Amino acid sequence: MIRSKNADITIEPLKLEEYGRCQNIWNMKTQPLTETWRSEIASGNRLVFIYKINGEFIGEGALVLEADDPDYTIPGRRVYISRMIVKKEYRNRGIGSKMLAFLIEKAKEMGFAEAAIGVDKDNANALHLYRKFGFTEVLFDGADEYGEFYKLLKRI
């Protein structure tokens, strides 16, 4: 957990019983993977961290330990950083940078040597952030049913 000096800003692990509060950050009703992610949290494969201001859910990021895609995870070596999202009205305030730095440090503490992240090609702000943090190696440049995206890698 990280606390700010004035103790109203924290980054904390998500408790499964609070998963529904993520609705404050993203629309859980229209996201088809909402229940899949809930199951991954329950199994311990998806470690979700929440950025809070005065207890309000503002940002979310996750570490996925094992995925079916070796570009994203290699057990014991590579972790997948997933669901980096900040509530729209709080964007461009450095919250994404704080979340990403926290997740990278957490992955390092857990013994991972690499972190992978996926990003839509048209998400210029996220691409800039990820490159600034050293996600410069392109593992995949292509598309799926959701559009064109990159899988990027950083050695940590």
Where are these regions (language model features)?
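Hydrophobic pocket-lining residues that define ligand/cofactor binding sites across diverse proteins
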Residues: 107, 112
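Residue-level detector of beta-propeller blades
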Residues: 57, 137-138
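Conserved acetyl-CoA-binding loop-helix of GNAT-fold acetyltransferases
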Residues: 86, 92-105, 128-132
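C-terminal "cap" of GNAT-fold acetyltransferases
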Residues: 3, 113, 120-127, 131-133, ...
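Acetyl-CoA-dependent GNAT
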Residues: 4-6, 16-88, 100, 106
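Conserved N-terminal entry element of GNAT/NAT acetyltransferase domains
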Residues: 1-17, 155-156
